[in-house]
Amino acid sequence: MAIQEIRHPLIRHKLGLLRRADISTKNFRELAQEVTMLLTYEATKDLPVVDCEIEGWAGNVTTQRIAGKKITIVPILRAGIGMLDGVLNLIPSAKVSVLGLERDEATLEVRTYYKKLVPDVANRIAMIIDPMLATGNSLVAAIDVLKASGCKDIRVMVLVAAPEGIAKVETAHPDIQLYTASIDNGLNEHGYIVPGLGDAGDKIFGSVQKD
């Protein structure tokens, strides 16, 4: 599995702000989108381009445009929605597919409770977005769904990742590409990434309980 921890100074600075315990919902949302934009830049560096001729202000100009497969962005509900605009800011024509996953309390297995994929998903590059890669169970399930739908080129962008989750995904799906702003220390006894970001979904949607 191709794993890239993007150590750009801007990402490191913004990630430090995201980790603050006293961060506001507004600032968390904005920073999450900004880091996502920077990850998107890296995750799309290998997209093919072709030459095309356009009419410029001083005559015809040879420029380039992206060619090849089109992209579908796949946010995992609910926290993945907080990264969506960060990708769309750079790829505004991308189609959006949505996956909702939850753990079945009886079997402890991850199940899909919502799936809305674009009709031609099999012919697109699928870019999964989710702020946290913790245990890896949800991400493995999401990739399972996309592969069952015919996807061949699957890329994942997460803000922070735990080594345990990376290992699980790599075992199940060694052919995907993973981009993250940070590979953190690991999981605590409650399954949270340390140092992590806390509950990214709660922080994005403003549902953090105050003492």
Curated annotation (Swiss-Prot):
Binds 1 Mg(2+) ion per subunit. The magnesium is bound as Mg-PRPP. 5-phospho-alpha-D-ribose 1-diphosphate binds at R78, R103, D130, P131, M132, L133, A134, T135, G136, N137, S138, D199. One of its GO terms (biological process) is UMP salvage. Allosterically activated by GTP. This is Uracil phosphoribosyltransferase. Catalyzes the conversion of uracil and 5-phospho-alpha-D-ribose 1-diphosphate (PRPP) to UMP and diphosphate. It catalyses: UMP + diphosphate = 5-phospho-alpha-D-ribose 1-diphosphate + uracil. Uracil binds at I193, G198, D199, A200. InterPro entries: PRibTrfase_dom, PRTase-like, Upp_B, UPRTase/APRTase, Ura_phspho_trans. Signal peptide: none annotated. It comes from the Bacteria. Pathway: Pyrimidine metabolism; UMP biosynthesis via salvage pathway; UMP from uracil: step 1/1. The keyword Kinase does not apply. Keywords: Allosteric enzyme, Glycosyltransferase, GTP-binding, Magnesium, Nucleotide-binding, Transferase. Its cofactor is Mg(2+). Belongs to the UPRTase family. It is an enzyme of class 2 (transferase). Its EC number is 2.4.2.9. Pfam families: UPRTase. One of its GO terms (molecular function) is uracil phosphoribosyltransferase activity.
